[in-house]
Amino acid sequence: MQFMLLFSRQGKLRLQKWYVPLSDKEKKKITRELVQTVLARKPKMCSFLEWRDLKIVYKRYASLYFCCAIEDQDNELITLEIIHRYVELLDKYFGSVCELDIIFNFEKAYFILDEFLLGGEVQETSKKNVLKAIEQADLLQEDAKEAETPRSVLEEIGLT
């Protein structure tokens, strides 16, 4: 996989993950071009399209489009399944994920993606293992926040 983009029906980019080195200018150009291309397609059209020397695989879930660019020899159906698995992981974590979950918890959406995909390839096929890793990271984060909470001198010596 070269990259994954999540964008709304209005064309607003919500998440982007690039697995190939490109300049910011090139990324913006690609994003703009692909968003326009995908949004212009009719709902009954095929979810695969040839674009430049890549294949684009996309799927719409509610108000979000999940769009991936893959190499010519990669399998479109597996990519569609990868998109679906990512949506399932988001659903499990957020409990029926919506666009607002992605907007306000984008770092979690990226973290889930990073636990699932590594370098554009599936790292972990088990939803259970991915969710367990995310729960453990959440616990670590909570523990770190508790450790940062300043305590009074009386609490330190056990007088409260």
From Swiss-Prot:
Listed PANTHER family: ADAPTOR COMPLEXES SMALL SUBUNIT FAMILY (PTHR11753)
PROSITE patterns in UniProt: CLAT_ADAPTOR_S
Cellular location(s): Golgi apparatus; Cytoplasmic vesicle membrane; Membrane, Clathrin-coated pit
GO annotations of cellular component type: AP-1 adaptor complex; clathrin-coated pit; early endosome; lysosomal membrane; presynapse; trans-Golgi network membrane
Higher taxonomy: Eukaryota, Metazoa, Chordata, Craniata, Vertebrata
Organism: Mus musculus
Short name of one Pfam family: Clat_adaptor_s
GO terms, biological process: adipose tissue development; establishment of localization in cell; fat cell differentiation; intracellular protein transport; melanosome assembly; neuromuscular process controlling balance; platelet dense granule organization; synaptic vesicle budding from endosome
Tissue localization of expression: Widely expressed.
Keywords: Coated pit, Cytoplasmic vesicle, Golgi apparatus, Membrane, Protein transport, Transport
Record CDD domains: AP1_sigma
Protein family (similarity comment): Belongs to the adaptor complexes small subunit family.
Protein name (record): AP-1 complex subunit sigma-2
Molecular function, one GO term: clathrin adaptor activity
InterPro entries associated with the record: AP1_sigma, AP_complex_ssu, AP_mu_sigma_su, Clathrin_sm-chain_CS, Longin-like_dom_sf
